[in-house]
């Protein structure tokens, strides 16, 4: 039986990584929960809106009502604040929470608490309790409860420190060296099964948008073992380090949750969100990883909500299903998606050679189409479209214009196919 998993908040990069890691699993059915209008509206088939924010007094009651009404089995927190809330209220939440205990989560949520807890360790950067303790510049300030590099900045003078510092910040030594994220996984017995370092090559709004796998330094592995020995991690977690002037690693932060860029190692075979579920369900786990170099780079992509209903898809063959001698994989994605939704697909073409032979050569099954119609050059495609609940896809402007004018249905060029893709499917 599938277990129902509620990811909250559903619109963070962490949430999308959890969703991408679980969406093909036969073990789970995914639900999303959101407090805001965000990209989750385009990616979750089962999205529950209207959540209060996690610091709202009514949040717990709302969450429990959602859990009860939808028979949710597990809540997968996807933001540092929701991780802390779920760990602190685990006994009150009507489902299993996929986060470790509140002591570990509380220490990780506050950089001040993290540095105080590990103050005897040499990998902790030098910190200053007040601006008056700072003698040499530059130094670095960052929010006590921030995440990533958001709100953090280099301070080069006392006047700049006085202008920017308040009690919500921690003051640290400036670390000029390279920055790394270290992805880790701890099983249900507290054993560190996975520890891999990666380079944060490009960062945007505190999120690593280009990251590269690399060999894990022994010093980094030692830090991981010491963190794992003193805190109670369960499943996936990560920490970030940076080198000081002497080339020594210093801890920047540690988090007990899924890293937002976990997709890097997911694509070497290590599915952190799924493995974490197995650990929380009490299953023994092991890890198999493909040994190759891999780089992850990401940017904004577009998802569309298009206001049309249709049951029929008419599309051309040349320069639509194929581009030169290659199959257009993006169009085929749409074709299979339409077929899965029960749309009736008609191939309407003026193909000059044997279309059946060419479909076979391209590896495209004729079973995808309800009908295959090959027209003479002199015939009009608009004469063959009778339904009004249809769309027409063709690279020819002249053909699209005639169909639009005569049939009054939406028409699409090949570059518009992306607007027809349903990312919830």
Where are these regions (language model features)?
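Substrate-recognition element of Asp-dependent hydrolases with the DxDx(T/V) motif
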Residues: 331-360
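A conserved helix-loop-beta module that forms one wall/lid of the active-site cleft
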Residues: 88-158
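Acidic di-acidic motifs
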Residues: 10, 316-318, 392-396
């Amino acid at each position: 039986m599938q277990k129902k998993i509620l990811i909250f908040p559903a619109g963070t990069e962490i949430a999308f990584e959890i969703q991408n890691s679980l969406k093909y699993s036969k073990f789970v059915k995914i639900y999303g929960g959101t407090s805001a209008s965000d990209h989750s509206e385009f990616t979750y088939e089962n999205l529950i809106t209207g959540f209060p924010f996690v610091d709202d007094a009514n949040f717990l009651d709302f969450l429990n009502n959602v859990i009860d009404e939808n028979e949710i089995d597990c809540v997968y927190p996807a933001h540092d604040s929701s991780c802390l809330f779920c760990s602190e209220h685990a006994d009150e939440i009507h489902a299993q929470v996929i986060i470790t205990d509140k002591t570990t989560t509380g220490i990780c949520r506050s950089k001040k608490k993290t540095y105080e807890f590990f103050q005897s360790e040499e990998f902790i950067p030098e910190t200053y309790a007040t601006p008056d303790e700072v003698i040499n510049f530059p130094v670095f300030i960052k929010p006590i409860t921030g995440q990533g590099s958001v709100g953090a900045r280099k301070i080069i003078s006392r006047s700049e420190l006085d202008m920017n510092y308040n009690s919500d910040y921690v003051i640290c030594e400036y670390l000029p060296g390279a920055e790394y994220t270290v992805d880790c996984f701890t099983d249900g017995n507290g054993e560190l099964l996975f520890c891999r370092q990666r380079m944060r090559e490009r960062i945007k709004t505190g999120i690593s948008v280009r990251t590269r796998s690399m060999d894990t330094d022994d010093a980094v592995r030692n830090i991981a073992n010491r963190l794992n020995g003193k805190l109670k991690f369960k499943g996936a977690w990560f920490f970030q380090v940076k080198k000081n002037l002497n080339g020594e690693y210093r801890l920047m932060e540690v988090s007990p949750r899924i890293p937002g860029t976990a997709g890097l190692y997911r694509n070497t075979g290590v599915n952190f969100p799924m493995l974490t579920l197995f650990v929380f369900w009490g299953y023994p786990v092991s890890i198999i990883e493909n040994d190759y170099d891999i780089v992850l780079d990401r940017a904004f992509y577009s998802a569309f909500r298009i206001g049309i209903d249709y049951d029929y898809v008419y599309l051309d063959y040349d320069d639509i299903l194929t581009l030169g001698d290659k199959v257009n994989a993006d169009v085929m994605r749409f074709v299979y998606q339409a077929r899965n939704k029960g749309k009736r697909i008609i191939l309407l073409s003026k193909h000059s050679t044997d279309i059946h032979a060419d479909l076979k050569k391209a590896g495209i099954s004729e079973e995808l189409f309800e009908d295959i119609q090959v027209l003479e050059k002199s015939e009009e495609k608009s004469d063959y479209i009778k339904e009004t609940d249809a769309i027409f896809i063709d690279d020819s402007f002249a053909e699209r214009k005639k169909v639009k004018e005569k049939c009054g249905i939406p028409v699409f060029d090949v570059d518009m196919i992306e607007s027809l893709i349903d990312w919830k499917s």
